Amino acid sequence: MRIMGLDVGDKTIGIAISDLSGTIAQGLTTIKRSSNKKDFERIKQIINEYEVGMIIVGLPKNLNGTLGPQGQKVVRFVEHLKEAINIPIILWDERLTTVEAERVLIEKADISRAKRKEVIDKLAAVLILQNYLDSQKNK
């Protein structure tokens, strides 16, 4: 079963997908947000195409563990997404994954600022999903 990882932002949704064994996450695409209906249709297409059995959605929390405004937006997004699809969705603590993604792109990939904006959400989705997959291996 493949697992999908989502990094939900105001303007884009980064999407990652696992391999069939649920071991390795890889970046798939970034969706430009338009409306929940259109966003959910695109997510459903990917679910069907890749036979996804579960979704992990990054939940942005403050460093002290509380939910800020962005975290509340993601919770609402997931509530609506659960009405549109019928596979399990897990919210996963994503504190600092976007910061980590940007650091990786700057230090390891030497990518320009403009190019970073294009791939950062997809890489954040990879980090969210890989963190989840790694946590399941250790159980």
From Swiss-Prot:
According to its UniProt record, which protein family does this protein belong to?
A: Belongs to the YqgF nuclease family.
Q: Which organism is it from?
A: Thermoanaerobacter sp. (strain X514)
Q: Tell me the leader sequence span.
A: none
- Name its cellular compartments: Cytoplasm
Q: Which UniProt keywords apply?
A: Cytoplasm, Hydrolase, Nuclease, Ribosome biogenesis
| Gene3D superfamilies reported in the protein's UniProt record | YqgF/RNase H-like domain
Query: What protein does this entry describe?
Result: Putative pre-16S rRNA nuclease
Q: Which GO terms describe its cellular component?
A: cytosol
Q: Which SMART domains match?
A: YqgFc
Where is the organism placed in the taxonomic lineage, from the top? Bacteria, Bacillati, Bacillota, Clostridia, Thermoanaerobacterales
One Pfam family of this chain:
RuvX
What terms describe the molecular function in GO for this protein?
nuclease activity
Protein's UniProt keywords contain Ribosomal protein: no
InterPro entries from the UniProt entry = RNaseH-like_sf, YqgF, YqgF/RNaseH-like_dom, YqgF/RNaseH-like_dom_sf
Record function comment: Could be a nuclease involved in processing of the 5'-end of pre-16S rRNA.
Q: Report the EC number(s), separated by commas if there are several.
A: 3.1.-.-
Please list the GO biological process terms of this entry.
rRNA 5'-end processing
Domain of life of the organism encoding this protein: Bacteria
Name the enzyme group at the top EC level.
hydrolase
The record's annotation in NCBIfam families points to: RNAse_H_YqgF
